[in-house]
Regions:
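C-terminal helical subdomain
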Residues: 160-169, 181-228
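Active-site loop of short-chain dehydrogenase/reductase
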Residues: 31-32, 59-60, 112-125, 160-163
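Catalytic loop of short-chain dehydrogenase/reductase
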Residues: 85-89, 93, 119-146, 152, ...
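Canonical Rossmann dinucleotide-binding motif of NAD(H)/NADP(H)-dependent dehydrogenases/reductases
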Residues: 1-10
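A short, exposed helix-loop element centered on a Lys and neighboring polar residues
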Residues: 105-106
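Conserved mid-core segment of classical short-chain dehydrogenase/reductases
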Residues: 47, 70-91
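The beta1-alpha1 cofactor-binding region of Rossmann-like NAD(H)/NADP(H)-dependent oxidoreductases
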Residues: 17, 38-49
């Protein structure tokens, strides 16, 4: 969506192969993009990645923090409780859901503040709204509450400087080959969310008039009850 609207898009990923198809798709529609490798578990990698971005593309006008992890998903039913969560699994979740956005914000917000504009948008999920028991097959998502809290803090700190910060709660299954393979998605295709429409929601946030900014947006399929 952003590339279609004329933005030069920087795709960050731990391994550039992961973003190659998206880079090709952007090019096929006439857009421009580049891939920069970035490991959220490494502060040095984050600093180097943004140094590369600034050198080759300039300071970002909009940053969408969209990072996920699978930690906890493979634990068996008898290991649902917190006492069975390995510390390294928790650390990985914290790197991505808490420390990661903190370090990325430190890289991009100073330039946005000095410029008097920009957007820092966080892609989150319903587990950021309240603590919930982790069920079998679910990732260790409760650290995402910290991601939402960070968005709230940054909203208070940077709105007056013209920087739009928002937490986007994607409350459902995003369409993908893996999602389509799930039994509940096959039985109820209406619960699957269109990723292009999600992208439009992020673009809407970035282009909002500053007289009426949205700081939290929850996207839920029409056929399911919103999470609270």
């Amino acid at each position: 969506k952003f590339a279609r609207e004329g933005f030069f898009v920087v795709l960050t990923t731990r391994n550039r192969v992961n973003a190659a198809a998206l880079e090709q798709a952007i090019g096929a529609q006439g857009g421009a993009s580049m891939i920069v490798e970035l490991d959220l578990a490494s502060p040095a990698s984050i600093s180097q990645a943004f140094a590369t971005i600034r050198a080759q593309a300039g300071d970002p006008e909009v940053v969408i923090y969209n990072a996920g992890y699978l930690e906890g998903r493979d634990l068996p039913p008898e290991k649902e409780l917190l006492e069975h969560i390995p510390v390294d699994m928790f650390d990985t979740a914290q790197h991505i859901a808490s420390r990661g956005p903190f370090l990325v914000a430190k890289e991009v917000l100073p330039a946005m503040r000095k410029r008097g504009g920009g957007s820092f948008l966080i892609s989150n999920n319903a587990s950021s709204l309240r603590g919930r028991k982790r069920l079998t097959g679910q990732s260790l998502y409760y650290p995402r509450v910290m991601m939402r809290t960070l968005a709230q803090v940054l909203t208070e700190e940077y709105s007056e400087h013209g920087v739009h910060v928002a937490n986007v709660v994607i409350d459902g299954l995003i369409d993908s080959p893996g999602t389509r393979a799930l039994a509940r998605a096959r039985e109820h295709p209406e619960i699957v969310m269109n990723p292009e429409k999600i992208a439009e929601a992020f673009y809407y946030l970035h282009t909002q008039d500053r007289s009426c900014w949205t700081h939290e947006l929850q996207l839920t399929p029409y056929s399911t009850k919103p999470s609270f």
